[in-house]
Amino acid sequence: DANGAWVSSSVMDARMESYIKNMFNAIQTQYPDLNLYAYDVCNECISDDGTRTANYGGAREPGDGKTENGKSAWVQIYGDNSFVEKAFTYARKYAPDDCDLYYNDYNEYWDHKRDAIYTMCKSLYDKGLLDGVGMQSHIPANATGFAGTDSYITAMKKYLSIGCDVQITELDISLENGKYTLQEQADKYKAIFQSAMDWNINPASDGRVTAVCIWGPNDANSWLSSGSNALLYDSNNQPKLA
């Protein structure tokens, strides 16, 4: 508030609704011809901490969200992740009728975090508030293990089983400074694309993989360190095996 104290959840409800309403109105007013086909309503709300996913519905620890890395000012105000459903409720109210509403997160293939995201998103989907899950997909090139190919594809299929769509929103596959080879990277890129196409050809639910976004044009223009070499083109813009 004006004195620097945390506001109540009811005050934040009003602020949230006002912001979401005005944001959608501004987009439609300033860009009347834009096809706003999808919108990321809430981003990175589930904790990486297994204790939080096991006991707090996956809500992050409360904190200011700035100096306290990994903590959430939203949880500081609401006490839990109840703000997520409120955000989707307001977004559904004010978004264009044909705009799909998404939840997006990272490390979304970790089993305990995956299950917390699934539970939250299934509840939102069942209430008619959510249309899709965004998988950020910043992953290493290993084929096995908790971040391996099977773990990733299992997570993708679990989200699709909700009945909602999935978009792979920020895909890059890191070599981790030579820990993995270009061939391993290519194999993992191929496996992910193949699994998405296979699902869409023979789906086991109403959900589809509707987009894949590669998170950068080449290795010289990446948010990752130079040794990651995580993209489809190298630093000289030459195509890699992937």
PLM region spans:
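Flexible, surface-exposed loop/gating regions in the mature catalytic domains
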Residues: 2, 45-79, 84-85, 95-119, ...
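Aromatic-rich peripheral "rim/lid" segments of glycoside hydrolase catalytic domains that contact
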Residues: 5-7, 12-15, 26-30, 34, ...
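Alpha/beta-hydrolase active-site loop
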Residues: 18
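Aromatic- and acid-rich polysaccharide-binding/catalytic face
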Residues: 37, 43, 99-105, 117-146, ...
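Structured alpha-helical segments in the cores of large, soluble enzyme domains
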Residues: 84-93, 121-122, 157
